[in-house]
């Protein structure tokens, strides 16, 4: 799978962790990657899926299913078990399964089919951050050119005990009751071998 991604995807990568309507299910996770040639990338992915060794308890018919929306049916590919999704996103998932589909000229990867369908539905309904007031307010102080950017509700991050929270510096954990009231925007720009951080905290009531 890593070789497939190296040959078919570009340098633009977006990792999303968002709440489902049923909070008992835990957050949904999706990795979105730019693709150089969608038709060729999908042809190669289909071949990869069809020629992969069969897993115990699964048949070939379950390797390709569909995500149905009011306007289109998207093929969903069940990939061989791998830790690559966790390596690329740092999202610790209980399953090694990865599901893939193509949407809007991009390759979407997720640990479950439900995450993919919810992500596509949000995009179809134009439920994106670009138009959100909190997003615009937080990015006003950031550069238009960057190599990495993170936006996260600090309260949600601190609730991910055993998952993403181990990446949070100890200072924020010690003062978690204070920082859970903020939205975190972190941006990193690389120039001449130097990494320049830019961090903005926005109070949620604003």
Language-model features, listed with the residues they occupy:
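Signature of soluble extracytoplasmic/periplasmic domains of secreted precursors
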Residues: 1-206
């Amino acid at each position: 799978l890593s070789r497939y991604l190296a040959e078919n995807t570009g340098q633009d990568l977006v990792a999303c962790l968002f709440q489902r309507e049923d909070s008992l299910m835990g957050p949904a996770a999706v990795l979105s990657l730019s693709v150089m040639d969608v038709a060729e990338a999908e042809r190669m992915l289909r071949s990869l899926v069809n020629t992969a060794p069969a897993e115990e308890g699964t048949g070939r018919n379950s390797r390709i299913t569909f995500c149905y929306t009011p306007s289109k049916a998207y093929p969903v590919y069940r990939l061989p078990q791998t830790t690559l999704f966790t390596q690329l996103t740092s999202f610790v998932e209980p399953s090694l399964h990865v599901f893939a589909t193509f949407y809007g000229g991009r390759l979407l990867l997720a640990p479950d089919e439900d995450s993919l369908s919810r992500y596509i539905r949000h995009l179809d309904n134009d439920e994106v951050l670009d138009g959100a007031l909190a997003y615009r307010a937080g990015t006003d102080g950031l550069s238009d050119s960057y190599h990495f950017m993170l936006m996260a509700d600090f309260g949600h991050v601190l609730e991910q005990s055993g998952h993403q929270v181990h990446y949070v510096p100890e200072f924020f954990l010690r003062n978690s009751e204070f920082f859970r009231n903020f939205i975190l925007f972190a941006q990193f720009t690389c120039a001449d071998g130097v990494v320049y951080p830019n961090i903005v905290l926005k109070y949620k009531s604003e």
